[in-house]
Design a protein with these regions (language model features):
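C-terminal membrane-exit region of the final transmembrane helix in multipass inner-membrane proteins
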Residues: 2, 349, 354-387
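Transmembrane alpha-helical interface segments in multi-pass membrane proteins
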Residues: 275, 288, 292, 296-342, ...
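Basic-flanked hydrophobic alpha-helices used for secretion and membrane insertion
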Residues: 123-124, 145-245
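The feature marks short, hydrophobic/small-residue-biased sequence motifs that occur predominantly
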Residues: 74-78, 82-83, 87, 91-142, ...
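A short amphipathic helical element positioned immediately N-terminal to and/or at the very start
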Residues: 2-11
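Peri-transmembrane interface segments
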Residues: 230-281, 289-293, 309, 313-314
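Membrane-interface junction motifs in transport/secretion proteins
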Residues: 26, 37-74
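Hydrophobic alpha-helical transmembrane segments of multi-pass inner-membrane transport and secretion
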Residues: 14-41, 261-299, 320-327
Length: 387
């Protein structure tokens, strides 16, 4: 009986109900968008980390993220081979280079370059295995087909069988390079596109770099060993001029940079908070006005013997109804926003069950907070004051 009563009170003023639902929908969409882009930022930042088939990684202690790696001596990586539990090690070189759009005259754009050792297939991504041998040719590269279109119609032209030769430049030194295949990695906030090549080709482009100084050292362990024990041994064995991380620690290292060392994480969290505030304020105004208009009826029920709990529950039911009815269209609009954001930015943004449940919980919370604030007038209302 209570639920219909709560609904009838809300539906009696349809315009007011629509305003309340609009506030919840707006807040829900804002929260979905802020959380979606924030999580896409973190996930896109670790595309490379997830694609590397290693159990541990060496980096310089001065490195802060993938976009700001500091080189260290390859000798440290080779020292790891003194442990029998280590199956192989592989150097990885990374850097940015200017890419010339072959379709647009004199249009250059920064692109992220990954140089790998072709002796070991330690990189898992679509398109790499079938093009592995092609990378042994001088001045060849694989192009990330998920790169932004500002780099040119590379994917479409290559799939049509066209030969793609363009220029890349580093420190004023331009080199012609041929795209011999496509692979899939994905863009991030730090990279609009990616190239994958052999490390000899990498060094031909980055002529100021030496093969003796690497950016990431990939370490693969022998199967069926105690990985944590070996990691502890390696940390004790290696000098302090390198840092050794497990794969999960390597992923967390990158995510922590974007979450704590940049303003991006704070900005998106602030957006979530502001979305909550907007929802609370709108729902509070609606519920407070509703309570004020029906105050005489409420105190009459009090005089008839109804407890405060009954009346408070009536208001909370209205808050819950507003939350549920507002969340459903907010969820659907969030799905639509995710679709277009992924389509036009190529960020890995998608609706997840965890996020959907979390935002629903936030929606209920904001409505209940608004309801709890709005019932103060009702809680202390005295029939003698009204009549």
């Amino acid at each position: 009986m209570n639920i219909p009563t709560a609904w009838l009170q809300l539906a009696h003023k349809r315009t007011r109900l629509i305003v309340a639902l609009s506030g919840i929908i707006f807040s829900t969409v804002i929260i979905f968008m802020q959380l979606g882009i924030r999580d896409a930022l973190f996930e896109s930042a670790v595309h490379l980390h997830n694609s590397l088939e290693g159990d541990a990684f060496l980096i310089s202690p001065r490195s802060t993220s993938l976009i700001a790696m500091e080189s260290f001596s390859e000798r440290r990586l080779l020292q790891v081979l003194s442990f029998n539990e280590v199956e192989l090690v592989s150097p990885i070189y990374v850097g940015y280079v200017q890419w010339k759009n072959p379709d647009t005259k004199n249009y250059w754009r920064n692109i992220f370059v990954i140089g790998i050792d072709l002796r070991y297939q330690a990189f898992k991504a679509v398109g790499i295995k079938e093009n592995w041998q092609k990378l042994k040719i001088k001045y060849t590269t694989l192009f990330d087909q998920n790169s932004r279109r500002e780099f040119g119609n590379i994917t479409e032209d290559f799939q049509k069988g066209k030969t793609i030769i363009t220029e890349v430049g580093n420190s004023g030194n331009n080199q012609k390079i041929e795209v011999v295949g496509l692979f899939e990695l994905g863009t991030s906030f730090g990279s609009d596109g990616n190239l994958l090549m052999s490390y000899p080709n990498f060094l031909r482009i980055f002529q100021n770099r030496s093969s003796r100084f690497i950016d990431i050292g990939l370490i693969k362990f022998q199967p069926d060993i105690d990985r944590q024990s070996l990691l502890k041994k390696l940390k004790k064995y290696l000098p302090k001029d390198v840092k050794i991380l497990s794969k999960q620690e390597f992923i967390n290292f990158e995510k922590n940079y974007w979450a704590t060392s940049t303003a991006i994480g704070f900005i998106f969290n602030l957006g979530v908070f502001l979305g909550l505030v907007v929802g609370i304020v709108v729902v509070y105004q609606i519920l407070y006005t509703n309570v004020a208009e029906h105050l005489a009826e409420y105190v009459t029920l009090k005089a008839m013997g109804y407890h405060n709990r009954y009346l408070l529950w009536l208001v909370f039911q209205q808050a819950l109804i507003i939350a549920v009815l507002g969340y459903i269209p907010g969820f659907l609009l969030g799905m639509i926003q995710y679709y277009f954001t992924q389509k036009y930015t190529l960020l890995p943004i998608e609706m997840t069950p965890t996020r959907a449940i979390f935002v629903f919980g936030l929606t209920l919370l904001m409505s209940l907070i608004a309801g709890a604030t709005a019932i103060n007038k009702l809680q202390y209302a005295d029939p003698a004051d009204i009549f």
